[in-house]
Amino acid sequence: MALLCAGCATSPHISPALDAQLAAGRPARITGADGALSAHRTQAILSKLGQGAAKTYLLKRHIAVEEAATRTPLVAGNKVTLLENGLATYAAMFKAIRGAKHNIDFNIYIFTNDETGQKFADLLIKKQTEGVQVNLMYDSVGCLDTPRTFFDRMKKAGINVVEFNPVNPAYAHGDWTINQRDHRKVLIVDGATVFVGGVNVSGVYASGPMKQLLHKLGRKSEKPSPREKKIKWRDTDVEIKGPAAAEFQKLFMRMWNSQHGKPLIGRYFPHLKPQGHDLVHAIGSSPNTPINLMYLTLISAIAHAQQYVYLTNAYFAPTPQTIEALEDAARRGVDVEVVLPSITDVPVVLYAGQSHYEDLLESGVRIFERKKALLHAKTAVIDGVWSTIGSTNLDWRSILYNYEINAVVLSTTFGDEMEQMFEQDRAHSVEITRAKWKQRPMGRRMEQWLSGMWESLL
């Protein structure tokens, strides 16, 4: 990592030489249920996956960079299920939690004391009383509005509860680093089933059909608020079954231990048999590393794209290198399309991102703003074979200050599903054209300019 520029704390940048050095002499390696695969077997898997010139180039060049940079394995033999909204995510989570036999590990940014949060808490307490050890880690800032008594009820039931980087320094577990937040959202059941993405535990996902689901699951549904009637949240998770679950378990353990959580002893790393054919890479990023690993691998994937780059992101306040990567891809003929929010819970970030629209549009990047929903997803699909879903936003906070977690999936079948989901979001969006953008009012231009001035501090 010596090639990373100095001053990354204020201006993250990946050296052009880093890509070549990381990839040099480092063929991609794949791990399976029983350990590392042979070079011959690895090459056979990648060759089959990379049929087509564009896919072959992306896999040959970028995957070696990704693996060398993250120093974690690409794991074969997984089944990855795309969960396109809060309804699908919660239903799958409830099913997995109900079926837990040994342990449940839950790392979450926001866990609200509302109807949805109470349902999760009730179910976790029920499993704890059945003898399943539940370990919950929540972020102190993300749960500022959640009373301590909400978590105390779970503690009294025997659940291990850890508050990440407490806002109150009296509760700190070491150095008080208030600006470093645990933005990860990951649920692991019995060390074998993983949920990862952008979905928090909150009633914002509970409008419409979600209210009916919660009612069926045993909690009387409250009447939707006027806000819930008007706005639904659009988010994405994935469910992963197979050997890659162990890599997410390791990431959870490291975070848990960093906060001095109670030692976790038990069946957390069972032998995991192959469940499918998807390759999965678990990537956890930290503000304590020279550069955000998910940021590095996304920039590299964009740089090696040959056909298309489709991004969907909730909080878009991009770094100069993110903009440069997108513009360079568009100029070399790659179809670069980005779906972003039109409405948001953090307007200053929305305006900061919009301050870059003009330059992106001039380079050929197509920008769409999602309507009739608050977009909270953080996903990408590139050349139909490389996809990522997780908690990482394309903003400075995710890159510099947050702990994040993503799943990278190599699969053409899953890539097709991701492309279809992107197309659905695009169909519910309005394209921002250069002509239309030049007509925006002066007041809005000032908001965007001022927000852009402060984007690295948001």
Where on the chain are the PLM-derived regions?
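Charged, low-complexity intrinsically disordered terminal segments
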Residues: 8-458
